[in-house]
């Protein structure tokens, strides 16, 4: 397999990515990353300049390549080598970038079926491409069937239970309710028209948050008639694992859904239910081989049996 540095244009903005090529492809996949300032590999730039190297889309690209599926993954606007401004990019622009990436992939892939594989926020865009009939199938990793506003509330409740005991005590002493504080911040964002705001001292992309809070994926999911794969970790605290079943109830095409054991939102084991507090430690482990095998197996079942034979090797190769 080989990785080629490529660029394509979206609404006049240069988007940089990696095309992973294979011989005799059975399909080709567009990989769409999750929320935050992340690059093509799903590595995130955190406040203060620190980087969280999750490598989720890189691992998927490597597994797919061994299974005979070339892929394109790309940096978000204002991240990695892409142009544009991350802080003023909303969900509509992210969808436009996904569509432009799919057009580039279609021209390069040479007539094979096109797939969209999204993680977290990327599942919304993968689902939209599937609903529009632009792809032959969609894989949704850590996806949701609820509005963004409901997801933010659910996240806050989950994360509050995972705070260290000392932090929970401080919140009680200060008479601070985490859920109420989250709602207050959300109301501030929704009442503003600014692209960028400061919330609790942190710079946030308010434009994206307004888009996300309003967004309801259910009507889009209900229009999908192509095959869909949904995978969420049983310890995910950023989207409800049970939404896998909700996605399955909404889509009209062939559906395969999995809630995988003790995996977190980063597709890695979280046996202690640490949530984001444990992310920096968990990324020392590889992306779950089970998840990679489920993806390549799903591709094989719909678009080519060669992916099954190659997929076992993909798990070991991409999981290192």
Model-identified regions with their sequence ranges:
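N-terminal cap/lid segment of alpha/beta-hydrolase-fold proteins
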Residues: 1-24, 28
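Short, surface-exposed "cap/lid" segments of acyl-processing enzymes
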Residues: 24-63
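Conserved alpha/beta-hydrolase
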Residues: 51-81
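Alpha/beta-hydrolase active-site loop
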Residues: 56, 87-108
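Accessory cap/linker subdomain of secreted extracellular hydrolases
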Residues: 141-218
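Short beta-strand/loop motif that positions the catalytic acidic residue
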Residues: 224, 230-232
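Conserved alpha/beta-hydrolase "acid-adjacent" motif
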Residues: 237-243
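Catalytic active-site module of serine/aspartate enzymes centered on a nucleophile-bearing elbow/loop
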Residues: 263-267, 271-320
């Amino acid at each position: 397999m080989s990785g080629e540095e490529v660029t394509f244009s979206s609404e006049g903005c240069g988007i940089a990515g990696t095309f992973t090529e294979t011989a005799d492809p059975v399909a080709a996949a567009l990989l769409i990353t999750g929320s935050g300032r992340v690059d093509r590999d799903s590595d995130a730039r955190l406040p203060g300049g620190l980087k969280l190297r999750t490598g989720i889309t890189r691992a998927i690209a490597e597994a797919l390549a061994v299974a005979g599926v070339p892929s394109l993954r790309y940096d978000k606007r204002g991240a990695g080598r892409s142009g544009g401004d991350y802080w003023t990019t909303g969900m509509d622009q992210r969808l436009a970038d996904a569509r432009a990436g799919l057009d580039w992939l279609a021209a390069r892939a040479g007539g094979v079926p096109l797939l969209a594989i999204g993680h977290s926020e990327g599942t919304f865009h993968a689902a939209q491409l599937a609903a529009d009939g632009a792809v032959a199938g969609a894989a949704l990793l850590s996806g949701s069937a609820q509005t963004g506003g409901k997801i933010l509330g659910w996240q806050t409740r989950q994360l509050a239970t995972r705070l260290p005991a000392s932090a929970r005590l401080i919140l009680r002493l200060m008479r601070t309710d985490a859920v109420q504080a989250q709602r207050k911040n959300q109301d501030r964002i929704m009442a503003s028209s600014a692209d960028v705001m400061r919330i609790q001292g942190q710079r946030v992309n308010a434009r994206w948050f307004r888009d996300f809070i309003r967004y309801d994926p259910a009507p889009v999911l209900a229009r999908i008639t192509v095959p869909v794969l949904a995978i969420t970790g049983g310890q995910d605290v950023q989207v409800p694992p049970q939404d896998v079943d909700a996605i399955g109830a909404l889509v009209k095409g062939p559906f395969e859904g999995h809630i995988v054991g003790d995996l977190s939102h980063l597709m890695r084991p979280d046996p202690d239910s640490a949530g984001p507090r444990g992310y920096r430690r968990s990324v020392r482990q590889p992306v779950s081989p089970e998840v990679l095998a489920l993806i390549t197996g799903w591709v094989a079942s719909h678009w080519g049996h060669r992916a099954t034979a190659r997929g076992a090797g993909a798990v070991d190769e991409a999981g290192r």
